[in-house]
Regions:
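Histone-fold recognition with a strong bias for associated Lys/Arg-rich disordered tails
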Residues: 1-179, 184, 197
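Well-ordered beta-strand positions in beta-sheet-rich domains
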Residues: 173-175, 224-226, 258-260
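A short, structured loop/turn motif at beta-sheet edges
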Residues: 182, 232-236, 263-270
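Hydrophobic pocket/interface hotspot
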Residues: 185-189, 195, 214, 274, ...
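Glycine-rich portal/gate segments that line the openings of hydrophobic small-molecule binding cavities
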Residues: 196-197, 205-254, 310-315
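Histidine-centered catalytic/metal-binding microenvironments
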Residues: 200
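Beta-strand/loop substructures that line and gate deep hydrophobic ligand-binding cavities in soluble
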Residues: 245-298
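A conserved amphipathic terminal alpha-helix motif
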Residues: 288-317
Length: 317
C-alpha cells in the first residue's frame, strides 16, 4: 500500500505545484499534497485548525515574504493567481533534490502521519514555519503524530443494505478524512463527470455523454451498467448514494453495486464514510466474492484519495 500512497502523495504535490505554475515540486508542495490526499495527517492537522485552504494561504504568504526580502513585489507575473490543474498544461514531474530525498525517506508504510513528521523534521524548517504561522506548535504536533494510528484506515465488512441490493450480496465500509469543506465534497461525489475518477477505470470503459451509462470491458467480455444517484440530508450529514444497474442481458434493470457516502463536517474538513455494496450473481459470483472483496478494499482506498484530489483541485484558494 505504501507504493500506492506514495503515488497519490507525489501526484497531489505535482498538482499543487502546477496550480501556481511552479516548475519544481518542493517541501511546501509535499506538505500541501498530504492535506490534499487526506487521511490521518490531515485529520490531525484539522484538529489543530489547519485545512488545505489555510495551508495554501500560508504557503502563498511565505512566498510573498521571501520576495519582499529580495526587494521584489508580488505582482501577477511573479506570483500568478492559482488555477485548477485541469485548466493547465502539465509539465513533467520535477522536484528539488531535498523534495526527492524527503519522498524517499518518508516512512509511508506507517502512514501519512509519519510522512508529516518527516517533513516537520526537515532541516530547512519550511513546514515548521508554515505550522507556526497557522498557529500550531510543531513540537506538540510531533508528539501527537508519534502516537497516531497507522494507515490506511481499516476497511471493515458490514451488512449490506437490502433496500439497495437483493441477496446474495456483501458490503464493506471505509472512513476517511478530507481537508476540504463538506459541501464541496458532496458536490464532487454527486457529479457524474467525476465518476471516472473513482467509480471505474476509464481505460477499460466507455461512457455516454451523461457519464452515467458505462460499458465495462474485461478481455472479450463486456457489461453495460447505468448509474444514478440520490442526495439527501440525514441529521447534520449529507448522504450521496450511487447505484449501478445492469443495462442488458438476463439481469437487465437489476441493481449490481452501490456506493453510499455519508459526508459530515469535521474539524478543518470532512469525515467521509463510504459503504460499497456488491451483488453476487449465481455460483460463480459467490465463488469470486472473496477476490472481489479484496479488490474492493484496494479500490475504496484509491477512491477516497482520488475524491480528495478532485475536491482539492476544485477549491479556488
Amino acid at each position: 500500500m505504501s507504493m500506492l500512497l506514495t503515488s497519490r502523495w507525489t501526484g497531489a504535490a505535482h498538482l499543487e505545484a502546477a496550480r501556481t505554475r511552479t516548475t519544481e515540486i518542493d517541501v511546501d508542495h509535499l506538505y500541501l499534497g498530504l492535506l490534499a490526499v487526506g487521511g490521518q495527517a490531515a485529520r490531525i492537522l484539522g484538529r489543530h485548525g489547519v485545512s488545505l485552504t489555510s495551508a495554501r494561504r500560508r504557503v502563498r504568504e511565505a512566498l510573498i515574504d521571501d520576495l519582499a526580502t529580495l526587494g521584489l513585489q508580488a505582482t501577477g507575473d511573479v506570483v500568478p493567481p492559482p488555477k485548477a490543474a485541469r485548466e493547465l498544461d502539465f509539465a513533467d514531474w520535477r522536484a528539488t533534490s531535498r523534495a526527492h530525498d524527503l519522498v524517499n525517506r518518508a516512512p509511508l508504510r506507517k502512514g501519512t502521519a509519519a510522512a508529516l513528521a518527516t517533513l516537520i523534521a526537515e532541516p530547512s524548517g519550511v513546514v515548521r514555519h508554515l505550522l507556526v504561522t497557522d498557529g500550531v506548535d510543531p513540537d506538540q504536533l510531533m508528539t501527537e503524530l508519534a502516537s497516531a494510528p497507522t494507515e490506511p484506515d481499516p476497511v471493515e465488512r458490514v451488512a449490506y443494505d437490502p433496500s439497495l441490493l437483493p441477496a446474495p450480496a456483501w458490503a464493506k465500509r471505509l472512513r476517511h478524512y478530507l481537508s476540504s469543506p463538506p459541501d464541496l465534497v458532496a458536490d464532487a461525489i454527486a457529479d457524474a463527470a467525476l465518476l471516472a475518477a473513482w467509480a471505474y477505470d476509464p481505460n477499460k470503459a466507455q461512457v455516454d455523454d451523461s457519464g452515467e451509462t458505462i460499458r465495462h470491458t474485461r478481455g472479450s467480455r463486456t457489461m453495460t451498467v447505468r448509474a444514478h444517484h440520490t442526495r439527501r440530508r440525514e441529521g447534520e450529514a449529507e448522504v450521496v448514494t450511487w447505484i449501478q444497474e445492469v443495462a442488458s442481458g438476463a439481469h437487465a434493470g437489476q441493481p449490481l453495486h452501490y456506493d453510499r457516502f455519508v459526508v459530515a463536517a469535521a474539524p478543518g474538513g470532512t469525515e467521509l464514510l463510504h459503504t460499497a455494496g456488491q451483488r453476487s450473481f449465481g455460483l460463480l459470483g459467490r465463488l469470486t466474492a472473496p477476490l472481489a472483496g479484496w479488490f474492493s478494499w484496494v479500490g475504496m482506498q484509491y477512491a477516497a484519495q482520488r475524491i480528495g484530489l478532485e475536491v482539492a483541485d476544485r477549491q479556488a484558494a
